[in-house]
């Protein structure tokens, strides 16, 4: 079944054999300043393989996906510390894309750098996600982002279609708080964490952001091939929905990450637009996210 058509219908659980939803590419990089023994490198290689397997082989939902319908995503893990054998600290960059209708183009839906990556992994370990159970921090991080990626993807195809998957991600946050690792609690000084990432998506005040995600992709990106000017107008209109959020919740991680990840795409889409249209768009983006004014100005180049 065509993925776009499927998501516009009421979601109905399927029985029987389940396909997997994600096509995840995993890369692990160790900082040059970190010494890595041959034994440690072997563990890291095994961890990469196990991460790839859990992301791509787990059936995260009850929906069926054809191979070509799987969500393309990337995990880039930057290891900055190895305090003990099999223990790792660093960052994880998570991104996902979705195809534009009637085109080979892929639009970035989610792009986020999580600075609270902490994981332990033993040689020969197998990562296995069990719903409603906390097993270890690494499994929780991976399951959280699997559901968040799926939620964002579904939101881009159907209005608030990702709600069940954001709820799953929120449940993972609640359970993972018992593990004591960073990134899961509202009390942390760094608000760019997993708690706020998913909590925001389920708060009523952020509903305009979810409408923006849908309008930007479904009414904007998906229209560019056949109705380019209408698509561009829909994209600009989608960003206008964000003003009430940023007026009360400035620098919100979800919105800022979304805008930041769309800059190159916007520059390409509006490259042939009138200068006034580009200037209006840039002024809006600067108003929404003043901290990245210089970045948004590149759309005018």
Residue ranges and their predicted role:
Residues 25-29, 213-301:
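A cross-kingdom marker for long, charged
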Residues 1-24:
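Bacterial Sec-dependent N-terminal signal peptides
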Residues 21-89, 100-102:
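Start-of-domain marker
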Residues 52-60, 151-154, 267, 271:
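Sec-exported extracytoplasmic/periplasmic mature domains
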Residues 84-199:
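Acidic/His-rich structured neighborhood in mature extracellular/periplasmic domains
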Residues 158-251:
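Flexible, glycine-rich surface segments
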Residues 38-46, 136-141, 253:
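Soluble non-cytosolic domains of exported or imported proteins
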């Amino acid at each position: 079944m065509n993925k776009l058509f499927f998501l516009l219908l009421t979601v109905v659980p399927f029985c029987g054999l389940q396909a997997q939803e994600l096509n995840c590419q995993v890369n692990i990089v160790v900082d040059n300043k970190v010494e890595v023994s041959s034994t440690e490198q072997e563990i890291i290689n095994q961890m990469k393989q196990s991460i790839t397997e859990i992301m791509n082989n787990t059936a995260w939902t009850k929906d069926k996906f054809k191979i070509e319908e799987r969500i393309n995503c990337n995990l880039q893990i930057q290891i900055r510390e190895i305090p003990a054998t099999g223990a790792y600290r660093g960052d994880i960059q998570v991104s996902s894309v979705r195809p534009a209708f009637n085109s080979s183009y892929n639009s970035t839906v989610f792009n986020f750098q999580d600075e609270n990556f902490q994981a332990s992994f033993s040689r020969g370990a197998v990562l296995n996600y069990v719903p409603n159970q906390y097993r270890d921090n690494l499994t929780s991080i991976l399951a959280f982002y699997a559901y968040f990626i799926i939620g964002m993807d579904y939101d881009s195809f159907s209005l608030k279609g990702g709600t069940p998957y954001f709820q799953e991600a929120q449940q993972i946050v609640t359970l993972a708080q018992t593990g004591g690792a960073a990134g899961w609690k509202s009390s942390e000084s760094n608000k760019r964490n997993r708690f706020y990432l998913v909590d925001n998506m389920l708060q009523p005040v952020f509903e305009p952001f979810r409408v923006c995600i849908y309008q930007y992709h479904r009414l904007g990106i998906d229209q560019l091939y056949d109705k380019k000017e209408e698509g561009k107008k829909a994209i600009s209109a989608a960003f206008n929905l964000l003003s009430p959020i940023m007026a009360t919740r400035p620098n919100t991680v979800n919105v800022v990450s979304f805008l930041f990840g769309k800059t190159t795409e916007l520059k390409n889409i509006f490259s042939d637009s009138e200068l006034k249209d580009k200037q209006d768009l840039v002024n809006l983006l600067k108003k929404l996210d003043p901290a990245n004014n210089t970045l948004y100005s590149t759309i005018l180049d």
